[in-house]
Amino acid sequence: MQPFDVIVVGKGNAALCAAIAARDETGARVAMLEAAAVDESGGNSRFAGGMMRFVYNSVEDLRLLADISDDEANNTDWDTNTQDQYYDDLYRVTGFRTDPRLSEIMITQSLQAMVWLRSLGVRFVPNYRAASAVVDGRRRFFGGMAIEVSGGGPGLVQYLDAAALKKGIEIFYETRAVSLIYDGERVLGVQAKHAGKVAEYRAGAVILACGGFEANPEWRTRYLGPGWELAKVRGTRFNMGEGLKMALDIGACPYGNWSGRHVTSWERHAPEFGDLALDHACHRHNYPLSLMINADGKRFVDEGAEFYGYTYAKYGEEVFKQPEQFAWQVFDAKVIPLLRPEYHGKVATRVTAQTLEELAGKMEGVNPEGFLKTVREFNAAVRKDIPFNPGIKDGLCTVGIVPPKSNWAQPLDTPPFEAYHTTAGITFTFGGLRIDPETGQVLDVNLHPIPGLYTAGEMVGGLFYFNYPLGSGLVSGTVFGRIAGVAAGAAARAA
């Protein structure tokens, strides 16, 4: 087989960005190895919502990316996500463990990366759907997430696919990488299996961008702990950890939160793996407006601690820790009109009632007496002197109960009532490889660069610990995918 300059393993956002950067910015001959068939390709990026967290100081920064009219610009509160805000959010949600240099590069290059994506044909639109609300007749964005990719994750992959094909990048589908070709000094390519046969793909550099181990129940049990083999998987069934294993087998240094994971509230009866046909029908992200109730009929988290983008990636784990690994999100008529469309989709396990007593009898697996007691205590604890405002952290809280509800706490007292059955859905795992942040080159256990080996995307360890600010994953994949692509292409071409 004709050798290439760069082999990219994977075909999600990070992999595509790496391949395009290597081809476009260094002139390298690039091939991609994708384990999935064409219709299932795209990795976890196909299952993403398309929201991307980047630095912006005003609506003028947003207008570099999206077509925003003067009327929209002047009559909307667009929020901000300054460098300082981004640093504060990332350090806070990761318990100040995020790698300083990795996070600095991701944050400071985030807007530039978004502009680069737009130059490749990626279309962005205001995120009216999930990050804004109309308050006192004026639209207000919140959570620093004012822009999303048109068409979500599938749209992002489609745009980047088109760019890759236009630039002459060759893609081998149903070709699962199984090992690195390594002579003891440098990586020389990849061995991969297609149609039951193993072939060699030689190259001057290899970029591993094929995700974590979230689809591998054996690895989940090993690294995340007993019981995690039972969790639903939000995304692709192809992320089995092979890229990590290949790198570790030749002495790459593991790094980051290997027992950590991005886990969200998910439809209780969703399929075992993500299903592209369901789009985002299984997401349950409106829990800040709910009471989350376990089998004992008790609350177990502060639902209103933050906007969902700062808690959703860890609250799924809290749901999974409950008896029988489920919870119910309970709403009343005051907030039901604010629920996202997926709550009323065909796949939602939903029960409705005109009284709380009736609702208690319909919530499968829940102790009715415990639930009614919880609601009575909650309603009595809600402050009455603070107005409800879903567009800000309104401080409408409870007093004297544990756990508290810090924002958006309204009495559950207005029929009809609705409850949604949820469990945990794993998106990706946090453990990865240690890299040189400036190049994306993988380091060995002695912290020396491994010649010819680079990584990007979920496989970069050290960015996320315990939790995750919404939209950072796609931006990390873009920033470090581009960095790895340029460095790998340049090194291969110079060899």
Segments (PLM) and residue ranges:
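Conserved redox-cofactor binding core of oxidoreductases
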Residues: 101-198, 217-219, 265-269, 375, ...
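An anion/pyrophosphate-binding glycine-rich loop and adjacent beta-alpha core
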Residues: 240, 244-370
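Glycine-rich loop(s) and the adjacent beta-strand/alpha-helix scaffold that form part
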Residues: 194-197, 201-270, 440, 471-474, ...
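Glycine-rich FAD pyrophosphate-binding loop
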Residues: 24-45
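Helix-rich C-terminal "cap"/substrate-channel and partner-interaction subdomain
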Residues: 320-417, 487, 491
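Beta1/beta-strand and adjacent pyrophosphate-binding region of the FAD-binding site
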Residues: 1-14, 31
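A glycine-rich dinucleotide-binding beta-alpha-beta segment and adjacent secondary-structure elements
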Residues: 179, 370-467
